[in-house]
Amino acid sequence: MRRSKADVERYVASVLGLTPSPRQKSMKGFYFAKLYYEAKEYDLAKKYICTYINVQERDPKAHRFLGLLYELEENTEKAVECYRRSVELNPTQKDLVLKIAELLCKNDVTDGRAKYWVERAAKLFPGSPAIYKLKEQLLDCEGEDGWNKLFDLIQSELYVRPDDVHVNIRLVELYRSTKRLKDAVAHCHEAERNIALRSSLEWNSCVVQTLKEYLESLQCLESDKSDWRATNTDLLLAYANLMLLTLSTRDVQENRELLESFDSALQSAKSSLGGNDELSATFLEMKGHFYMYAGSLLLKMGQHGNNVQWRALSELAALCYLIAFQVPRPKIKLREGKAGQNLLEMMACDRLSQSGHMLLSLSRGKQDFLKEVVETFANKIGQSALYDALFSSQSPKDTSFLGSDDIGKIDVQEPELEDLARYDVGAIRAHNGSLQHLTWLGLQWNSLPALPGIRKWLKQLFHRLPHETSRLETNAPESICILDLEVFLLGVVYTSHLQLKEKCNSHHSSYQPLCLPFPVCKQLCTERQKSWWDAVCTLIHRKAVPGNLAKLRLLVQHEINTLRAQEKHGLQPALLVHWAKYLQKTGSGLNSFYGQLEYIGRSVHYWKKVLPLLKIIKKNSIPEPIDPLFKHFHSVDIQASEIVEYEEDAHITFAILDAVNGNIEDAVTAFESIKSVVSYWNLALIFHRKAEDIENDALSPEEQEECRNYLTKTRDYLIKIIDDGDSNLSVVKKLPVPLESVKQMLNSVMQELEDYSEGGPLYKNGSLRNADSEIKHSTPSPTKYSLSPSKSYKYSPETPPRWTEDRNSLLNMICQQVEAIKKEMQELKLNSSKSASRHRWPTENYGPDSVPDGYQGSQTFHGAPLTVATTGPSVYYSQSPAYNSQYLLRPAANVTPTKGSSNTEFKSTKEGFSIPVSADGFKFGISEPGNQEKKREKPLENDTGLQAQDIRGRKKGRGVIFGQTSSTFTFADVAKSTSGEGFQFGKKDLNFKGFSGAGEKLFSSRYGKMANKANTSGDFEKDDDAYKTEDSDDIHFEPVVQMPEKVELVTGEEGEKVLYSQGVKLFRFDAEVRQWKERGLGNLKILKNEVNGKLRMLMRREQVLKVCANHWITTTMNLKPLSGSDRAWMWSASDFSDGDAKLERLAAKFKTPELAEEFKQKFEECQRLLLDIPLQTPHKLVDTGRAAKLIQRAEEMKSGLKDFKTFLTNDQTKVTEEENKGSGTGVAGASDTTIKPNAENTGPTLEWDNYDLREDALDDSVSSSSVHASPLASSPVRKNLFRFDESTTGSNFSFKSALSLSKSPAKLNQSGTSVGTDEESVVTQEEERDGQYFEPVVPLPDLVEVSSGEENEQVVFSHRAEIYRYDKDVGQWKERGIGDIKILQNYDNKQVRIVMRRDQVLKLCANHRITPDMSLQNMKGTERVWVWTACDFADGERKVEHLAVRFKLQDVADSFKKIFDEAKTAQEKDSLITPHVSRSSTPRESPCGKIAVAVLEEITRERTDVIQGDDVADAASEVEVSSTSETTTKAVVSPPKFVFVSESVKRIFSSEKSKPFAFGNSSATGSLFGFSFNAPLKSNNSETSSVAQSGSESKVEPKKCELSKNSDIEQSSDSKVKNLSASFPTEESSINYTFKTPEKEPPLWHAEFTKEELVQKLRSTTKSADHLNGLLREIEATNAVLMEQIKLLKSEIRRLERNQEREKSAANLEYLKNVLLQFIFLKPGSERERLLPVINTMLQLSPEEKGKLAAVAQDEEENPSRSSG
């Protein structure tokens, strides 16, 4: 409330009366001046502020306030002087500088001070529009001299703000003032593409004036005719825009004048028409706009006039709209806007949309209205009446366009709704998503019977916005979706419609349209709605102004709660019901399953919000909020009588959602409980669909009866609907379909029931009519009722509507044509590749590699993107030159590229086995290639026994198709097995039907034989067959690319509870440089283990999720504040973030001090929790004696465990075991495991202490195996290695490769091949396991093997470097990444390529082949940079790049050049390169530990019995020899007696119970991994005896092993069985031998164990060792903590000592000072002499200095005596 002058005077008098001091009275003058300023007494305000300034002259606020008072009095000079003084006192007042500049420019522009202050303000406000206007004023006053500067100023401002209307108009005016009309026209032409300018009334007025002036000028006459036509085109477009804007903002008289001017422009352009050029097309379109605006002006005149004849005006307006609607759309493109859209096309859509809707609105409820209008006014009389109504001038009609136009050829053409919907989409683009336009369109559709296409409108505006969100409970702006915006538009249209109805009910003529034309109608939405819509558009299109983003987000966030009916939404229940009904109706009309699910799901959401409100309405009304987003209208309030009906609608919607989700039984139950025609209709649909599903196959009598029952129920429900409709006509309105559709469907059902009564359509004469049923699926009978897609909804993803079956034949035909084209292209590529040169890019010599069976075929389009899911997250993968498509396609073996059968339920786990086979063999999860013709194909001769099974299996939904004659997998021995004993995996599977192809070879090297056939067209056809799918009766559309199986994310935090989590910045103190270093930004968590109660602190970096803090919380830890900050805490802990325990000093910085204090409280609370838990921290174990014993015991058990594991895994022995004979699916054992060692690597090891039953048929490690064998032996090596897991439950039998890449490719040539699990790679990790190892606190998740494409390649060079790419556009080098650059050579085809990936992200930044024509060149100015040109595939596509790589050292750069040249040479010679990392040969240790060798030598010390001669070859082949380059280890032949003698091994076991020794194989009770324990048969063969006697000293050469392996492969089945039985005697012939103690040795422990017992012993020992290792680690961590504390104590002691020394020295100095003062002031004599020793001692004077000091003392004694004398 403003105070009056009298109030202020009374208050001032009272205050001054209480203030005796004059200075204090003056000090209150500022406050008094503000009070008088509020009372508008400016003179009194100046008086008091001046008194204040007299005592406080340096107060800038007072001077500014005085300047404001002078400015109000328009005393500019004094105001500027006060402001200037204020700025001098406080220079930070930027706005005051701008104020001074504006005042000076306003007062006198020529004043030199104005220029100074404008330049000063420009430095403070760069790019400000206000500064531009001031500069413009300064330059305007210079006249013609300043035009050039003004032009430069405007151009620079346009560059910054091209949408500024004032700047554009100013430029055009400058052109016009300087008579440069041509430049002005050119600028107008260019600026027409700017949407912001086209929507400005001032700009369009300027354009019209400029173009008219140009056309009338002499310059136009001198120019060519095309320029004149282009200017006329721009003029007509500008008139159309100006007319639209004038209709919306100006009065009727101005509209008439502008329309008349538009008329004259059209008339002048009419005479120059000819041809099909831009002017003709624009003229025709502008003619339509002219008549549309004429009709809108007529209705506007009726709105603003008095005593208006609405009938006459509406008839003339309808005539105008008819002419506008019948103007054809332009056929040529005029120009494109910013979005690349045709301008004329958008304007035509807008014209047709507005005209069409207005025609429907004017003719609504009036029969033959348009026909009467055409008959009455489509003539000269009507034309004259129209002219008189629009134009008030007395100009002759013949000279005007409207008076001379021919309007007599108008047809009575009413717009079609489908055409209008299409025009609306284009009109929305023209208006750029204006909420006013969208609301107007919604109001037009609100009166039409069809639903508006709001979804299509919004998709045009927001292309990338999701349709629905899964987070309806949140209000985050990021969660906004299309459905939210659709609901918002529905609400705006709904409330606008109700508001218009209320206004029109009082005074409304039948000829007056409910909603006026778009240009003349008032604002249809509220300001709140408009601001929210604009904020959403700004956020989605990311056009927010900096600094305004937070405000927009808050605005959007607030209204999302209302749109989703969350919390206190304040929505009227009637609006919620309207939303729910609209969404349910729209969803039911969609053909998309997901569209139905989203729409009906949102409808259910709103119904659930309405139901509680309906219960409240029964008791009382719902209060209306004060300022709602959507206004409440009492005319639509829900009455109590309507509540039951709405509740029924809600439950029907719930049931429909159940049906859509596939819960058919729940939906049927819900529908049956509701007695309504809508529920009857839905029940009829459900039962009819069930009957159709049964009809799809040949019917048995039971299925035929079931189908008849469903059809009977359908008929009954349809009859109920018809009966209810006849009795009550209002019921028919509730039906989602017309009543005629119900009757048509009833007739169809009745016809089907009659067919069943005649004997059934599918079962006649006791025979199945397969052909008829198939024909029925592809071509439905014309008499049968087929439900329209718009009349129904899908019930589940697996149940598509019947109309999709009509497309099967078309899709099949297209698939066949595509396959034929693919084959032709493959043959063409094959022929071209044969004739091409060796170095053709990129298909050179990259045929399919030899890969294991089971790969589903390869794509032969090299270089094309492959849309298959690999192991990585990327879906689209481009094939690089060194990647073969077979490897990429491997993980997507069960992807259906085109269509898949929805009935296929077969998985590898269902039948209990998963076996890798060739592409010709049987397949799992993929239907057999071919279409319906495949079903009628004649079965092959070899598969006669399986054909019937195939048909039955297909009917039951198992897509199992066993292979043809080329199948290479058989289970001959297993199928013939009759023994029920022995080792079995799992129980018998009742679903298992046996195996096919018995008697054939168990495993064969298919791809080894295919090496010479890789480029034949037949193989391409086989590969393509893998993608062919079989049409099923029930079609299911799946995505082309199937995502990989979801890998469960294991973080190590699963069993822990989050007690605290907060975002912080973590620092680590670096002791070397003595400073804090940032470690990461992320959430710091305190986790509590639910099992043992331990607490730990964990933090991961954002995005990369790298652990940057991970340590236990102990009671000894304490937080200390970081000096200089109240938001940071520091502490010390033994951290495991890098994997090893390391004492770290950490600090966490929080956003606010409150968060830091909260963290401290939580930390201390956690420490108090630890006091209640039994202490398990390491400091309890600090007992030197006990610790020493624990360490000793752990080391002993660790050593023994290693020796025992080494013997069991037996890396130097080959394993060959006989297949077990099992029953059912219990198949165990391995077939001929044959491995050919490479020249540089040892053979792989088979580890039998880990068993693996997994679903995967073949691991990706097959293609990445480090075993490099010959082409003939490579496939068996990779295929036939088995791993069996410990779990034997169920019948999930899996053949899986045990090979895994244990080291990087760069290390393969300097270490032996390590195969198996990570913890048991004995050969290469012996030294690593001897060292101490600290496990992290958080266990890592299981390793997910990643395929990089570099598995079958050796690394010949690898070093860190920085790579650059030359950008031709900007003409400079650009950095592409930093990482390891590698030169890789393929083992198979010897091709060499360069690969480089970025650090951390591993993104490819170089990937190309090395070709002979490539050469490295030094970059000018440096010798460490190499430059070359190559066709690179780093971005997935072939692209010629200029690359440069820079190394840190010159030696590395030279080495890269050397290896590069060697690679080209080796590639030409087809030879392998010696890798750079293995040039220096390093001595290799024995792959077996010394203790393990001692154990074996001790075991084999006694001479064994003689081995039978027939077994020599097998015994030799069982010995695995490591083909290292240095020395080969001793080959040991197993003795029949097995004695544990080594003390290290003996300590492992504690039980001396003797049991038979067997390892899992029923026939190998007397054998262990190839070592025979059975009684050997006597033989006189001396040769074999010598071999056996040599024992461990005998050596077997690798070539002999290879020969024996190959001979094993080539043997027949009979010989194979003989050999296996020879080396592994059967159970009947085996004799159990005990392990006897040697006579010469002291009595030792005898061991006879089974394999299970040994495995159990090994497990318990491993657990014990792990426990002891854990204790060791705790001791080590405690010791580290104690050592750190000792260091801290020592440093503290040293600090104290230094302080003591300083204090002592300070005391000594003080004492010396006192002594010297006494010496100086004492009188000469004996007292002074007594101080001399003290001074000499403290100052450590030399003898000479002592003498001088004594002489000084003596002189001082003699001087007084001399003076007295």
UniProtKB/Swiss-Prot annotation:
TPR repeats: 26-59, 60-93, 648-681
Compositional bias annotation for Acidic residues: 1317-1329
Compositional bias annotation for Polar residues: 1231-1244, 1580-1593
Residue spans of biased composition, Low complexity class: 778-797
Domain GRIP: 1702-1752
Pfam families documented for this protein: GRIP, Rab_bind, Ran_BP1
Post-translational modification Phosphoserine, affected residues: S21
Disulfides per UniProt: none
SUPFAM superfamilies: PH domain-like, TPR-like
PROSITE patterns: GRIP, RANBD1, TPR, TPR_REGION
Keywords: Phosphoprotein, Repeat, TPR repeat
Residues carrying Phosphothreonine: T19
Domain of life: Eukaryota
Protein name, per record: RANBP2-like and GRIP domain-containing protein 8
Organism, as annotated: Homo sapiens
Protein encoded by which gene: RGPD8
